[in-house]
Amino acid sequence: MKYNKKILKNGLTVITSEMPSFESATALVMVGAGSRYENKKNNGISHFLEHMAFKGTKSRPTFMEVAGVVDGIGGEFNAFTNKEYTGYYIKAGKNNIEISLDLLSDMLQNPLLDAVEIEKEKGVIIEEINLYEDTPMRKIADIYESLLYGDTPLGWDIAGEKDIIRSITRKDFVSYFDSLYSSSNMTVVLAGGIEREAAEKLVEKYFVNMKPFKTPKPPKIKENQKVPKTLVRHKKTEQAHLALGVRTVPLDSPERYPLFVLASLLGGGMSSRLFSEVREKRGLAYYVKAASDQYTDAGSLVITAGVDPKRAEEAVEVIISELKNLTSGKKKIKAPELKKAKEMIKGHMVLELEDSRSVSIFYATQTVLREEVLNPDQVLKKIDRVTERDVMKVAKKYLSDKTLNLAMIGDFKDKKKFERLLKL
């Protein structure tokens, strides 16, 4: 699944990925504008702006007119906000790609940002925040990253805080939009049943008037953790949720591939080490999984689990014991286990990329965040090349007491009982 890259005169990057057997096509616009570009006064505005983009343009002044365009072609449209980017996409029949580009370009060049709609949408955003607060399985990731990155934009919640959301004005939106929504800070990806040259001409037609300008860079993370840290959020829940992890590497590090395999080996499937020990052997958790996450200047290997609150300490002990068993060599990585961990990653990736939307996100995130853009085959080969020695090297290097972090949500008032467990 190859791609073509073209940069227009206004600095806009265009990626096309032809998938000849597909009857559908996705048009995605990704902007290098996420919550880590915010400050204390406008935290949450990246996500809020994503909502407002659908609320009307100069030529389509209402949400119903915007939505009607997509409904009229039987498509789906949505958007998503990350800490480092925001994406807007429409997926529809391949013959409707021009309609998709027309609408997306209109939304991102001519948003009304109507003051009345802003006030109305504040209620929606606040209820979304409430939803996250009442969903501890999701909220635990936010708490974990606040522990890792502290009082910095990378440590703040993407949705923001309610009081800040209530205070945001139209002027704030215009200022934020005008500082980051530049053609030179944008990537358009077209994936699916498209023809490259025709698709590139359509992008140029609808985005040619966008202006390039220099955009600000977010503050870099300075990591100097030397002791383990714990953060416990007290909440009366039937199930406790934990995130236990260590600091690792940023997005461009070659070590990220061994870390992907390490995460897969530990908690990538139902036969993984942690699933076997924590759930199957001891019945401590409903879910337990591991992931390796990266930003442009930071990264983390994190294990998450939903556990019986009365046995939460035992669950943490078992997880840490498994990490020790790995780094000490007590439980060696054998060839079949390594192969299975790699095949798990590869299989999930292949299945995910059967969808043109996933393909568009795959290329867009790389283009916005990285110097190098790889196609799926290149990524799969990098996973294949990971050896047992590579995995053990990153395990011993990063699974350390000094950068160990534990976040928990549950009916706990004393974090000291968990702090004493954080020894690798």
Regions found by a protein language model. Give the residues of each.
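N-terminal glycine-rich anion-binding loops that anchor highly charged ligand groups
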Residues: 15, 21-23
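Short clusters of small/polar residues that mark proteolytic maturation junctions
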Residues: 18-19, 53
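A conserved active-site cap/scaffold subdomain adjacent to cofactor or substrate pockets
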Residues: 251-252, 256-270, 274
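M16/MPP (pitrilysin/insulinase) zinc-metallopeptidase core fold and M16-derived inactive scaffolds
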Residues: 26-91, 268-284, 295
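A short acidic-to-branched-hydrophobic micro-motif
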Residues: 27-31, 104, 240-242
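Phosphate/diphosphate-binding glycine-rich loops and adjacent basic-rich segments that engage nucleotide
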Residues: 227-238, 245, 254
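Charge-rich, well-structured scaffold segments of protease-associated domains
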Residues: 2, 7, 18, 65-215, ...
